[in-house]
Amino acid sequence: MSQTSLKQKKNEPGMRSSKESLEAEKRKESDKTGVRLSNQMRRAVNPNHSLRCCPFQGHSSCRRCLCAAEGTALGPCHTIRIYIHMCLLWEQGQQITMMRGSQESSLRKTDSRGYLVRSQWSRISRSPSTKAPSIDEPRSRNTSAKLPSSSTSSRTPSTSPSLHDSSPPPLSGQPSLQPPASPQLPRSLDSRPPTPPEPDPGSRRSTKMQENPEAWAQGIVREIRQTRDSQPLEYSRTSPTEWKSSSQRRGIYPASTQLDRNSLSEQQQQQREDEDDYEAAYWASMRSFYEKNPSCSRPWPPKPKNAITIALSSCALFNMVDGRKIYEQEGLEKYMEYQLTNENVILTPGPAFRFVKALQYVNARLRDLYPDEQDLFDIVLMTNNHAQVGVRLINSVNHYGLLIDRFCLTGGKDPIGYLKAYLTNLYIAADSEKVQEAIQEGIASATMFDGAKDMAYCDTQLRVAFDGDAVLFSDESEHFTKEHGLDKFFQYDTLCESKPLAQGPLKGFLEDLGRLQKKFYAKNERLLCPIRTYLVTARSAASSGARVLKTLRRWGLEIDEALFLAGAPKSPILVKIRPHIFFDDHMFHIEGAQRLGSIAAYGFNKKFSS
């Protein structure tokens, strides 16, 4: 009901109403008008509604424009026609309707690979555009809008819209004579649209996505489809990132990736620190256990990561020839039966037995000088025997008082695969095939041969003898001698006197021995040091001795005795030295030492010459 009819009713005779009834009736009319206008606005925002298209003075239907509802909110014969390019923002809790008439630029920038740059993916240009919207433009991606309403017709507050250079047409005072256009069906989406890039955090599109996620996604897909169809992509001919080297790819990763890696390394470092603390607590408890039990005469074992681990085969530590014969002649079951029957029979010492006794004496001396010392020899018994055979081995170890706490019984499986897990520094076995397998794994290994049983060895001093070439040093001198002769080799070595020799497989073990020797030297125990090293080489001191000694000096290593034989036999020297083990690469010298009763080891040259 209009205001004119209200005045007529007020002037008619017989219509006497109080001021309160008139005010109540006005409020009812205002409420009805507000409800009607809100319903019309809701229909106008609907994308399928007929008011979605806007006929205005010859202006054809534009999918980027939205015609507001026609109503009587502002009085009769007043029509609201507002053509807007909607971009909703949410700022400080208020909805702002941005009226824009901008249009995308037809020319899109691409990078070196032909992809659109990030700013080109945005449908709204950062700089306002005054170009009029085209008829062929796709329909607006936004399907929800808030129109500004009068304070008298709407109880919800709204702010005035912000305009760009192209302002909307003025309000018309005449109602529209054209019928509303029929609703247009939305275009079908592409079957496999490409994934749009990640939007900027401060962009307006994120606000649209929060307002209406479904409509925002449809608008993005239409935009990508239009961009892809309008201009083909041109790809650069540079090779992919995966083809580049790792050094070239480092610059491609963003800083966030580097931060993630740094944080990951910090986590790993923290985890290692926790593991170290747990391990330290465990070994502290082990030490307290040994100290609180006077009946336990065995000292606490060293930490594996700090110790010098020597892995021994059971055949190198004990004499197991009889059991080996039974296994080869009668099979595994008879061998197992034989070992179980004789598990209380103590095994006789093998070729590495005296070597182990000398290692234990060095550990005892180090514990006397350094009670908390962890840099000790740790012996591991490694065998492919069955676990039941281990009972006889344990009984024999305890009978001789050997401090061997770690066993590896693989039950017929090759134990070479466990060497690295045990942090092995040196592997000694009686089987040359096992030694070659360990060498292929990169572990210093040697085959130990037994000497004369009646020869006396010193148990209070560890004596280790090394050959020079292919043992402490590389085998390049042997190859040079074979190719050019001995005279040329002497001349070459004299010219290269100041050039250090390349390291050999046993250089690391000599470093370990030297590190332990320095612990005794620090306590003024040089003359009473329980470790003594020997260099027994066929080189000539006059021609190549200086280069050998300078190489050891360059490495920071000391050798107690250097014996240059100039091609003479080594066996008489080894008999005089009586080393617990002699590392040599030539089988001829080992056989000679074996005949004279010296314990020798072989098996190094294959690693460096192959």
Curated annotation (Swiss-Prot):
Catalytic activity: a ribonucleoside 5'-phosphate + H2O = a ribonucleoside + phosphate; AMP + H2O = adenosine + phosphate
This protein's encoding gene: NT5C1B
Keyword Magnesium: yes
Location in or out of the cell: Cytoplasm
Region of interest called Disordered, as start-end residue ranges on this chain: 1-34, 101-277
EC number from the UniProt entry: 3.1.3.5
Protein's job: Catalyzes the hydrolysis of nucleotide monophosphates, releasing inorganic phosphate and the corresponding nucleoside, AMP is the major substrate.
Protein name: Cytosolic 5'-nucleotidase 1B
Compositional bias per record (Polar residues), positions renumbered to this chain: 119-132, 236-265
Entry comment describing in which tissues the protein is expressed: Highly expressed in testis, placenta and pancreas. Detected at lower levels in heart, kidney, liver and lung.
